[in-house]
Amino acid sequence: MSVVEIEDGVFESTATIDNGSFGTRTIRFEAGRLAQQAAGAVVAYLDDETMLLSATTASKSPKEHFDFFPLTIDVEERMYAAGRIPGSFFRREGRPSTDAILTCRLIDRPLRPSFVSGLRNEIQVVVTVLSLDPKDLYDVLAINAASASTQISGLPFSGPVGGVRVALIDGQWVAFPTVEQLERAVFDMVVAGRKVGDDHKDVAIMMVEAEATENVIELVAGGAGAPTETVVAEGLEAAKPFIAVLCDAQAALAGAAGKETAEYPLFPDYGDDVYYSVASVATEALSEALTIAGKNERNDRTDEIKVEVLNRLAEQYAGREKEIGAAYRSLTKKLVRQRILTDHFRIDGRGVTDIRALSAEVAVVPRAHGSALFERGETQIMGVTTLDMVKMAQQIDSLGPETSKRYMHHYNFPPYSTGETGRVGSPKRREIGHGALAERALVPVLPSVEEFPYAIRQVSEALGSNGSTSMGSVCASTLSLLNAGVPLKAPVAGIAMGLVSDDIEIDGKTERRFVTLTDILGAEDAFGDMDFKCAGTKDFVTALQLDTKLDGIPSQVLAGALAQAKDARITILEVMAEAIDTPDEMSPYAPRITTIKVPVDKIGEVIGPKGKMINSITEETGASISIEDDGTVFVGASNGEAAQAAIDKINAIANPQLPKVGERFLGTVVKTTDFGAFVSLLPGRDGLVHISKLGRGKRINKVEDVAKVGDKLRVEIADIDNRGKISLVLVAEESETAADAPADAPVDAATTSS
């Protein structure tokens, strides 16, 4: 991979992505021109029009009191990148969009484990979107830009990290697909990894974020291959060559423009002497405590042992209490992993493929449109569904291609779910990420707006947490949506998997052993080598998220984990089906929404001047009305009668049956003038009773003497001129004409016309 010095001190390297018949994409990395005071700054380009600046900086002194690595990732979306002015009141960018937050998480997940352990200097990576071609997504380019700027910054970073989006289109995995190409994809994956091995030829997958597309069921029905576990595993392998090319380009740039790695003070969690002392004091008691099945009881006992250890060693290691706590945690991790690898048993007594006790229930919140409670062991999730008019869809003001969102999934994780105290209020990045994962899992099975003309808000309340509340949210949401009457194309369930690996000595030989865990606990998530969440129907995967701490997972191990996840998913789906397997009747508290179509040229008439007509229909019927630009009208009401009344009035305007001469109506006076009274016959259709016709043969001087606005008048159409103007005459009341009426007189049109 060559590097070009395009001017003094400005270097550029290029990665070419070859997609065969789908064409090529070019990713360029440039260093030395912009943000030169940052420790490392790189401009990344995707083809010619998408441009990102990533700047990495580090604090001069470490935060010694921190017991974690203070890495911050920020993504700044600039609206000028798309040639737009922000839609906020102040017309400038404010809090980050959901897309920006999710991109921050995509960058953080592979970058964080690539820094040397024990680093306590604050590190900040800021990615600014400077220009964006609307046909492209910027998130994957941001991963590469962040890695490249960090790689040249002189920080102790074991990169570079390459990130790629691959989509399965017409049977081929296409890298860096356009938004238009994604519409034809059945599956979409963001994969990040780095090159490993002595010769740096292997690629270790570090992070995966994947989903089936919104059109997957229609595409599969049309002959496309379903995204099964086997297909997903093939996609991960297909991503590796692209990642290698991106890593090579970044490494070449770092070779030309990178700084020497500086010396940074490292703060190991504990010293070897502390660990040895903790292990000698606590191993026996801790091993016994880790066999307690209940989370609270187990945590109480391990906390007691920790206090005993601190008391016994406090004098010996005065001032190093934090090291004692860290060593105790490390010992706990070792014992948990040891038991899994040697005995194939876990801290709660389960085997490696066992799922905790499952429970599913619907209709748990009285007035909610749909609700459900899903429990898996000590993880407890309540799902609540709310239905409303499509106009209540979320409007999105970001750089992404999505401008509105009809299905909104919100995830809440209150501190009491883990028995702790903490801040409540606006969602944190983790909550936004978990909600987005659950949302992606369900979008492929949602009905279209034509099939189900509602905006849907799904809220997942994590009431208890001990392992994968995000996958519990998928299960609770499926149950809740069905309870609300949403006709899902298929039910979806999710499960969290884990992986533990180590070198085990057997008969004098050392071998690498991998054990995949089904339905991991919170502790197994923290102490394991992989966190792998998988959601899907009984037939295919709808969403997948993977993070690993290992330098590569053998493909057969990953394939086995996917198959193990499917077995668990099928088991959970069977339990869910016992609670509800088809959509329920809609709640009486949910609005009844109907759609009708009106000619586009009639939209203005339905709305009326300054909204007068549509507002009057809303006031008279109590229905909510929303009109789209294509003439689709959504009518919502608390009952069917109100909705039908509104539909009748709209149809009378937009799809009218033109009145004929001789028809009679019971109309309402809507306006009086010096020359007569205007009478409303149908919505949007008025006629004039001339003043000379108002006196029933007698002369009147003032229209208001005989007709006031709001009066009901029985009228007959006397004439319709070539401009459509209607002339009316009064019809004698029945009491006045009953004696003279012939036997075959026509029925009053007021009872037959509309």
From Swiss-Prot:
Q: Which residues bind Mg(2+)?
A: 525, 531
Q: Which cofactor does it need?
A: Mg(2+)
Q: What class of enzyme is it?
A: transferase
Q: Which UniProt keywords apply?
A: Cytoplasm, Magnesium, Metal-binding, Nucleotidyltransferase, RNA-binding, Transferase
Broad class of where this protein is predominantly found? cytoplasm
The record lists the catalysed reaction(s) as: RNA(n+1) + phosphate = RNA(n) + a ribonucleoside 5'-diphosphate
Its biological purpose is as follows: Involved in mRNA degradation. Catalyzes the phosphorolysis of single-stranded polyribonucleotides processively in the 3'- to 5'-direction.
Q: Per its UniProt record, what PANTHER family does this chain match?
A: POLYRIBONUCLEOTIDE NUCLEOTIDYLTRANSFERASE, POLYRIBONUCLEOTIDE NUCLEOTIDYLTRANSFERASE 1, MITOCHONDRIAL
NCBIfam families in alphabetical order: polynuc_phos, pppGpp_PNP, PRK11824.1
> What protein is this chain from?
Polyribonucleotide nucleotidyltransferase
Organism of provenance: Mycolicibacterium vanbaalenii (strain DSM 7251 / JCM 13017 / BCRC 16820 / KCTC 9966 / NRRL B-24157 / PYR-1)
Gene that this polypeptide is encoded by: pnp
